[in-house]
Every structure is written in C-alpha cells, then in structure tokens.
C-alpha cells in the first residue's frame, strides 16, 4: 500500500467493507479533502476515520451524556517527516510527544518542530494530571467537548481549537459504524 500501487477499484472495495451504504459519499468526501492524494493515502485516511476517529467521537459523546466528568477531545495533525512523510499522524503517534521523547527516527525523525510540539503536549498532559484540566500556558484555552460545538484541540505546529472538525466525514462515519439496536 505504501508504494502507491493501490487502485481506485481496490480502494472502493476496501472502503465498502467498512462503510456499506455510505461508501460513495465517503469516497467523494475523501477525494475532495485530499485532491492530490493517491488511493493509498485516501484508504489510510478512511481506515483511520472508521477504526479510530469516529469511534473516539462516539465514545466522547457517550461520556458527555453521562455528565460525570469533563471531556476533552484532541487531534494530532502534525505530519512526521519520517519515511519521506508517508507516516503521517497515525495511531499512537502522540506517545513520543506526551513523554517528550521525539528523537526516535522511525516516528518523528527528531524534527525541530516535533521537539517544540512535544514540550506543549507534555505540559498539557502534566496540567491535566495535576488539575483535571489540560489548560496551560503552552496551548490556547481548551474548552470541554460538547455535542453542541464539538470543541477539539488540534495539536500541530500551531495548536488551535477547532469546532466539529471534519463535520461531513463525522456524520457519514457515524451512520456507517454506529451501533444498532
């Protein structure tokens, strides 16, 4: 898949296996979001969307509904230069940042901006562990997650709060993977 040999037909087949009736709309959404992306790039984005991102969103919604504790949502959008930039921000990519250990060549390639981001993210996790709130001077004010605005901290070269990121994909994936019954 990394070598770019995935065809549009194979992309469709693999997305259909997880998206069902939402396949056409999701493929269009990913094509629009990644116009220069190869089929392999769009497949990785789609599988990330279905296997990790939207399920995290659905879980956050359940916790918000319980009203027992504040919920905070984040997205790591920083793109690693490792492996010619093909690694992207993948599952568990946040761990080197949380532990302020970004010198690993296979994940962050020791990039200078990775070190800066690690200082911000590790300060954020420390603040959360100490106070129950991630707010600290290293990042913008981080509001709690709520269904009304879906405030999400985006960790990247420039950290920022985005409301309901990837709205269209969230709605499509929510319908495709939501539990029934």
Each predicted region: which residue ranges?
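Polar, surface-exposed loop/tail segments
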Residues: 75, 79, 131-158
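Extracellular/periplasmic catalytic domains that process cell-envelope and extracellular macromolecules
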Residues: 66-67, 89, 119, 145-147
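Tryptophan-rich aromatic "cage" segments
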Residues: 158-181
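Short helix/strand-capping connector loops at secondary-structure junctions
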Residues: 97-107, 148-159
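Non-catalytic, well-ordered alpha-helical segments in soluble enzyme domains
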Residues: 114-139
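Substrate-gating cap/lid region and adjacent catalytic-acid/histidine neighborhood
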Residues: 1-113, 124, 131
């Amino acid at each position: 898949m990394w070598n770019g040999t995935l065809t549009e037909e194979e992309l469709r087949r693999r997305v259909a296996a997880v998206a069902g009736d939402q396949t056409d709309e999701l493929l269009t959404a990913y094509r629009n979001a990644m116009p220069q992306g190869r089929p392999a790039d769009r497949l990785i984005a789609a599988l990330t969307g279905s296997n990790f991102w939207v399920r995290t969103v659905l879980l956050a919604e359940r916790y918000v509904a319980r009203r027992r504790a504040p919920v905070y949502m984040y997205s790591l959008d920083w793109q690693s230069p490792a492996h010619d930039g093909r690694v992207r921000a993948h599952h568990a990519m946040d761990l080197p940042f949380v532990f302020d250990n970004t010198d690993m060549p296979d994940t962050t390639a020791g990039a200078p901006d990775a070190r800066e981001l690690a200082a911000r993210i590790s300060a954020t996790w420390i603040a959360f562990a100490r106070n129950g709130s991630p707010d600290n001077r290293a990042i913008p004010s981080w509001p709690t997650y709520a269904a009304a605005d879906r405030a999400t901290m985006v960790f990247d070269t420039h950290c920022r709060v985005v409301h309901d990121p990837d709205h269209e994909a969230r709605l499509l994936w929510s319908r495709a993977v939501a539990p029934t019954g």
